[in-house]
């Protein structure tokens, strides 16, 4: 896959939460492969080790090493700056964001991707589980955005724009069985995105979200392994999406990169579906 703007993020800096695997890692690699300096924030970043707050590993600022391929398969580890933080821990989030801003000299793009799943009906989970999921999926975005906004404002003042991209879900726009808590959290992200876009549009900070369908990520793989028949469950998830397959992490990353790009300068308050047609298509059954 090629891009008409291979260096569209040159000179820009980005922070990707939940960046150690799946959609977050694919996004970080793609942004770096197109010229950005990228920090990944996660609770654990195995490739770099370390357990404390702030910067971990051997990231060399300004010394990015790119691999081949559109999604940087690399970039190599050295091109991504790891910062360790739990998005439910406000002091840790503030410290991690400050570390990235200090290392890069600013911040142009925030990708709020960190999140966890939940299964069951409205009766299935107790109050503690509801609080836990909302704390990560919704309040986590609030914490990282709040910590990053001063740097994003400075970037917008200097360059004319900055960007926040949130990861919502098709669960925010379509009713899925056994996903009440997860859907509530992702629906909140959808609404949060619109409200943030309205609040910050006059500061030239664009706020958008992606709404992925079921993606082929390590998290989904773990869910499948817990199913009584993992192969049958995978086929059911594929069949639920009109294109007949799972969404790839790289496809979601490409959508995030578009929304974060300076070339999307007039795009704000938008939810971009990457769901194989799941939210919008109503197909007839295939001929027997």
Cite the ranges covered by each PLM segment.
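Short C-terminal tail/terminal secondary-structure segment
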Residues: 2-5, 174, 268-288
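Substrate-binding pocket helix/loop in short-chain dehydrogenase/reductase
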Residues: 121-122, 126-134, 237
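Active-site loop immediately N-terminal to the catalytic Tyr-X3-Lys motif
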Residues: 123, 174-180, 202-203, 244, ...
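Active-site helix of classical SDR
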Residues: 145, 185, 193
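Alpha-helical segment proximal to the catalytic Tyr-Lys
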Residues: 150, 198-199, 265
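Residue(s) in the substrate-gating loop at a strand-loop-helix junction
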Residues: 169
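Short, small/polar-rich loop/turn modules that mediate ligand/substrate recognition or access, typified
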Residues: 201, 206, 267-269
């Amino acid at each position: 896959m090629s891009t008409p703007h291979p260096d569209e993020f040159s000179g820009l800096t980005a922070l990707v939460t939940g960046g150690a695997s799946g959609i977050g890692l694919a996004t970080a690699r793609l942004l770096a492969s197109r010229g950005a300096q990228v920090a990944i924030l996660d609770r654990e970043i195995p490739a770099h080790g370390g357990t404390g707050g702030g910067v971990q590993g051997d990231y060399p600022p300004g010394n990015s090493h790119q691999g081949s391929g559109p999604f940087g398969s690399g970039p190599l580890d050295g091109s991504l700056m790891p910062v360790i933080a739990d998005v439910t821990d406000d002091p840790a989030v503030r410290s991690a964001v400050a570390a990235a801003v200090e290392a890069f000299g600013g911040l142009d793009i925030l990708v709020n991707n960190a999140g966890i799943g939940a299964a069951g009906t409205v009766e299935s989970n107790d109050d503690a589980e509801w609080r836990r999921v909302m704390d990560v999926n919704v309040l986590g975005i609030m914490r990282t955005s709040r910590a990053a906004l001063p740097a994003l404002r400075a970037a917008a003042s200097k360059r004319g724009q900055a960007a926040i991209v949130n990861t919502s879900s098709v669960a925010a726009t379509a009713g899925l069985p056994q996903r009440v808590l997860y859907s509530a959290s992702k629906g909140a992200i959808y609404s949060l995105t619109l409200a943030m876009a309205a609040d910050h549009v006059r500061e030239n900070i664009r706020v958008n979200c992606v709404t992925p369908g079921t993606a082929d990520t390590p998290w989904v793989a773990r869910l499948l392994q817990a199913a009584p028949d993992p192969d049958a469950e995978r086929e059911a998830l594929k069949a639920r999406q009109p294109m007949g397959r799972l969404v790839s992490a790289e496809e979601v990353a490409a959508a995030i990169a578009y929304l974060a790009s300076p070339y999307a300068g007039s795009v704000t308050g938008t939810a971009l579906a990457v769901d194989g047609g799941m939210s919008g298509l109503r197909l007839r059954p295939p001929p027997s």
